[in-house]
């Protein structure tokens, strides 16, 4: 009996001639039986040889595949790897990330921006959107310009160059005025300064819409009448280094309150100046060592060894910690229309704050009449914020609006309110409850005279910025995320509550659906989900409204101008794709994937995965090492669709890892009640919960090779996660860079906002102390990195954590850098190389040698 395959139905059937005969004679039956038996044996022998031969061929093929995998390393690389691995030097050179000077509207007609050829250009909407060069690329490159300000008449451009960092947001710099018509440079220096060399100044800006200058030097403010004038008028006289600051913030205010290098605001016509004075005389002092190491002091000019100073000197900083005195602040208005006879007026804080500690969060002029300023104050606990309106001539202030935090929460510091021209109403950002538990940042409209408050934006998404209030057309333009897509950012418009139209009109997203409003430009923005925008100022019917739309990702950045009424594309201003895509194209780049993971109490973590270039959905049995970057700082956001090429991109490309970023409870757009008065609890546990979910659901993640790292607050979270000890089985090792260890020694403004005062929440401070968990960190699993001149998270934190680890006999790796601040800018290549080396050993990552061998083998196979 034979078996064969039916070609049509793919079934086994009996041949038609294999039938059973009955009633034949014995002789005939015997003869026929012998013949059939002989034929059957011959066929069976032939089939067995065929089967054996087929098995040998299959075995050889399988052996070849196994050998290829063993020799080359990864079968997926042979099949799918395109481009070369990114090198760290290529990342740090900065050529892969587009950099551009900021752009701005100078008037309703003129928009200044840096074009693709590097020049500073100006677009004129009144001249058929023509673009002319204001400053050539050559001029900008000669000075290595890092910032600029144009005078309103476009006759001068103020350059900022040769920046030297002081604090995180503040710096000293050289300032140069460029005369546009004469193509001439005018260095900015004070009258008494030497003329032979440029002078480092703390801040320089134009005085309102004039060509007069405001200069801040040694914590005092000076006035210069014109760019060509060499004489100055001193406006303040109280400045003291490290103690009293006029017109610029002290360390705490630039770090966590104003987050800006300046604290002065000039009136529209330049006749009045509003400025803040910060007094740190009662603030405690922090000391840190200063070695003054440089290549010359150690190696000498010819490379020969020279002895460094035997002992380091020390530097000091006024650094307020929780429960200790904070800086006092005063707000002043000075009339500088008569520069020879200055009049000063002190702006008083609200009565509710007079006998309490408080912060100044923002200030500014209202309208163009120089008769009103607005000020936003917040109490020390940061659960009560008051907006004041101060009126000329005595500048007496009245309270116009109060915001109070919900129970078990705090108030986030927001941008300054946007006022109507008459000052009778304004817009502000505030937390608004959506649903039973969740709150989101939305726009409130406050009418001062009628004491009416209306919420203008709604929904389960975050408003991040109010762009412009067009009081002529009664439209408000703002930026916000899209519901269920918090990593995106879009341009929205909503009507204000005008008297002509009392109906409530829902906000409308301009960029969410490119097939709708932006139909004509949908192909230009097809790889854009993260936008910013700049709307032209408009104060009467004579000017047409326009907006410049900036695509910031996930594709390469570009920008174009649109008509605000029809949304028609008018002109492309810059497009980085032609210049940057050829550079990126040669690299094996990771793929970005975003998803949500459920958390307790109905919350959902936002997760972003950078999948390595060799990853494919069909490779279900591949197991990739995992590296998680944590931030965790309350109010921060890590998961975004903005274009980025950072160390995570490099690690995914170079070391074939799945790189993960998380936003858990406490992040912007997430509930903050769960971490109020208990830092280091829920947001730390969420890091474990999310990874357990991902490892269970996605089989391509290697459960045995998971690392974690973070910087600053993220470094603190990393130490706390590893400090869970046996309570977590997810993370094998981690790196804390410039971490916070004990919240009693972090800055008062941030810490008290969430934790309260130590005498009111002592238990919370103890439980949040990372040094208390040091004994639970597994040996050889922790790498601590810190700069000894770190002002954000002082070096004391690293020392305390290291001491706790040592006392607990935990073996760990420790690296410190002399004279380096929080960002470790001067040694960043060494830092990244050290981090990569640690994870290569801990997670058994691809080393450069292994990668080189595989790439050489792949080239040979081609």
Predicted stretch roles:
Residues 362, 499-501, 509-514, 518-862:
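Serine-hydrolase catalytic core recognition
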Residues 2-530, 536-538, 545-546, 555, ...:
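Beta-propeller folds
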């Amino acid at each position: 009996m034979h078996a064969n395959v039916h070609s049509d139905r793919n079934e086994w059937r009996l041949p038609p001639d294999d039938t059973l005969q009955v009633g034949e004679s014995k002789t005939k039956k015997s003869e026929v039986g012998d013949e059939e038996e002989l034929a059957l044996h011959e066929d069976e022998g032939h089939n067995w040889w065929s089967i054996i031969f087929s098995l040998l061929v299959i075995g050889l093929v399988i052996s070849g595949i196994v050998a290829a995998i063993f020799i080359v390393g990864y079968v997926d690389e042979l099949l799918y790897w395109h481009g070369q691995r990114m090198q760290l030097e290529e990342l740090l050179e900065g050529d892969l990330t587009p950099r551009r000077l900021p752009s701005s509207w100078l008037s309703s007609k003129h928009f200044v921006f840096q074009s693709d050829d590097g020049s500073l250009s100006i677009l004129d909407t009144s001249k058929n959107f023509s673009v002319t060069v204001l400053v050539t690329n050559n001029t900008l490159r000669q000075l290595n310009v890092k910032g600029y300000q144009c005078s309103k008449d476009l006759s001068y451009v103020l350059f900022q160059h040769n920046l030297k960092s002081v604090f995180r947001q503040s710096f000293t710099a050289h300032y140069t005025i460029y005369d546009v018509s004469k193509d001439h440079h005018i260095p900015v220096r004070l009258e008494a300064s030497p003329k032979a060399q440029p002078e480092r100044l703390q801040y320089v800006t134009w005085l309102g819409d004039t060509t007069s200058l405001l200069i801040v030097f040694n914590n005092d403010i000076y006035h210069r009448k014109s760019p060509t004038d060499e004489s100055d008028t001193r406006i303040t006289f109280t400045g003291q280094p490290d103690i009293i600051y006029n017109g610029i913030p002290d360390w705490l205010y630039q770090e966590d309150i104003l987050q800006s290098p300046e604290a002065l605001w000039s009136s529209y016509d330049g006749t009045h100046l509003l400025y803040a004075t910060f007094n740190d005389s009662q603030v405690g002092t922090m000391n840190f060592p200063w070695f003054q190491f440089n290549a010359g002091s150690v190696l000498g000019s010819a490379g020969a060894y020279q002895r460094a100073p035997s002992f380091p000197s020390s530097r000091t900083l006024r650094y307020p910690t929780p429960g200790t005195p904070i800086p006092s602040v005063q707000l002043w208005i000075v009339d500088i229309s008569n520069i020879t006879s200055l009049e000063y007026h002190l702006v008083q804080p609200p009565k509710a704050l007079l006998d309490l500690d408080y912060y100044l969060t923002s200030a500014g002029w209202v309208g163009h009449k120089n008769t009103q300023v607005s000020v936003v104050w917040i109490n020390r606990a940061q659960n009560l914020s008051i907006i004041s309106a101060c009126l000329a001539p005595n500048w007496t202030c009245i309270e116009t609006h109060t915001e109070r935090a919900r129970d078990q929460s705090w108030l986030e510091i927001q941008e300054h309110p946007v006022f109507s021209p008459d000052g009778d109403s304004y817009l502000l950002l505030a937390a608004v409850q959506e649903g039973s538990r969740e709150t989101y940042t939305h726009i409130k409209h406050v009418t001062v005279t009628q004491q009416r408050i209306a919420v203008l934006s709604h929904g389960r998404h975050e408003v991040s910025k109010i762009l412009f209030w067009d009081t002529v057309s009664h439209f408000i333009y703002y930026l916000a995320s899209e519901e269920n897509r918090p990593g995106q950012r879009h341009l929205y418009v909503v009507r204000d509550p005008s008297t002509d139209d009392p109906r409530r009109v829902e906000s409308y997203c301009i960029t969410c659906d490119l097939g709708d409003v932006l139909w004509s430009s949908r192909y230009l923005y097809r790889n854009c989900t993260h936008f910013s925008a700049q709307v032209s100022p408009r104060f009467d019917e004579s000017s047409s409204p326009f907006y410049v739309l900036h695509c910031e990702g996930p594709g390469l950045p570009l920008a174009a101008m649109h008509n605000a009424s029809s949304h028609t594309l008018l002109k492309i201003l810059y497009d980085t794709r032609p210049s940057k895509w050829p550079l990126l194209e040669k690299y094996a780049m990771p793929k970005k994937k975003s998803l949500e993971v459920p958390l307790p109490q109905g919350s959902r973590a936002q997760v972003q995965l950078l999948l390595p270039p060799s990853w494919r959905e069909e490779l279900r049995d591949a197991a990739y090492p995992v590296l998680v970057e944590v931030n965790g700082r309350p109010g921060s956001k890590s998961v975004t669709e903005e274009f980025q090429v950072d160390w995570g991109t490099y690690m995914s490309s170079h070391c074939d890892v799945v790189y993960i970023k998380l936003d858990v409870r406490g992040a912007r757009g997430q509930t903050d009640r769960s971490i109020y008065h208990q830092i280091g609890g829920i947001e730390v546990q969420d890091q474990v919960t999310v990874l357990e979910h991902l490892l269970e659901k996605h089989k391509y993640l290697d459960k045995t090779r998971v690392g974690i790292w973070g910087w600053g607050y993220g470094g603190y979270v990393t130490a706390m996660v590893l400090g869970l000890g046996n309570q977590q089985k997810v993370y094998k090792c981690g790196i804390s860079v410039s971490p916070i260890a004990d919240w009693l020694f972090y800055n008062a403004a941030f810490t008290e906002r969430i934790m309260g005062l130590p005498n009111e929440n002592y238990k919370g401070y103890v439980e949040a102390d990372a040094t208390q968990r040091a004994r639970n960190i597994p040996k050889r699993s922790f790498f601590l990195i810190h700069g000894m001149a770190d002002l954000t998270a002082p070096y004391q934190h690293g020392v305390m954590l290291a001491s706790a680890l040592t006392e607990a006999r935990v073996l760990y790796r420790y690296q410190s850098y002399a004279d380096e601040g929080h960002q470790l800018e001067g040694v960043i290549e060494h830092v990244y190389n050290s981090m990569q080396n640690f994870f290569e050993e801990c997670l058994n990552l691809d080393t450069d040698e292994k990668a080189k061998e595989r790439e050489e083998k792949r080239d040979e196979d081609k």
